[in-house]
Amino acid sequence: MVIETDLALPDGRTLHVYDTGGPARLTVFWHHGTPNLGAPPGPLLPLAESLGVRWVSHDRPGYGGSTHLPDRTVGNAAECVAAVADALGIGEFAVMGHSGGSSHALATAALLPGRVKAVAVLAAVAPFGAEGWFDGMAAASAASLRAAAEGRAVKEKHEATAEFDPAVFTKADFAALAGSWSWLDDVVRPALGAVGLIDDDLAYVTPWGGDPAAITAPTLLMHGADDRMIPATHSKWLASRIPGAELRLTPGDGHISVLDHAADALTWLAAQDSSASDATTGAM
């Protein structure tokens, strides 16, 4: 069961929080994609329970029940996570995300090195300005982000007339959307038209406010080798930047079908926590 609450922040804003609660061996903060609501990934709930994982997440500002925060950065996610963790009495935790949510997870790890124990991300977006950032991107995806790079007014004008282009997805993506990850429809539809979508894209093309090179936690980067929305070169760049990061490219997968490997990523997170616990015990 997922419990939903609203957290009042000191500046008067609200964060809408999701929490599976209960005793857990590891807490994982989920960072949602664009545009999504923040509910933890339904297809992974049974596995999480078997692994002893507690999911905690929130709607990013401008989505769902979370107050809009103009000009937020990707790094702002660390402030949100810290506020939620403090309110729930959680000290250390792992982070996980998909697509743009992966970037927010990585920034959280970079900015909260003393609290983030491990990182697993899928189809991550590299910081803007990374070499070849637009290379290999589907035309519609590139046009949307180029509009964001021109500023809010241009991005808003673009969104007013933009239509979905099926070329951004592969056959494997559509199969995942119709089957194993049809759950995404539950979190995407309520987020369409939200100001959070524009804020997200503006954040992706501005400095994060945190350097991936500062990440000290074990990090797993998974990316579909055939991703047309955010090409795998983004995760390759991140892997070259994050100390000790593990890169797994999944052949034949696109931006959505890479989620068929999310269970492996979650299992990997739990294993990192076990390894850290074993090392600590052995040192005592």
Stretch-by-stretch model annotation:
Residues 33-46:
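The serine-hydrolase catalytic nucleophile loop
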Residues 48-68:
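Conserved alpha/beta-hydrolase
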Residues 76-94:
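Conserved acidic catalytic loop of the alpha/beta-hydrolase fold
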Residues 91-133:
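Conserved hydrolase catalytic core segment
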Residues 136-210:
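Alpha/beta-hydrolase
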Residues 215, 221-223, 227:
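Short beta-strand/loop motif that positions the catalytic acidic residue
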Residues 228-234:
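Conserved alpha/beta-hydrolase "acid-adjacent" motif
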Residues 244-284:
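Catalytic active-site module of serine/aspartate enzymes centered on a nucleophile-bearing elbow/loop
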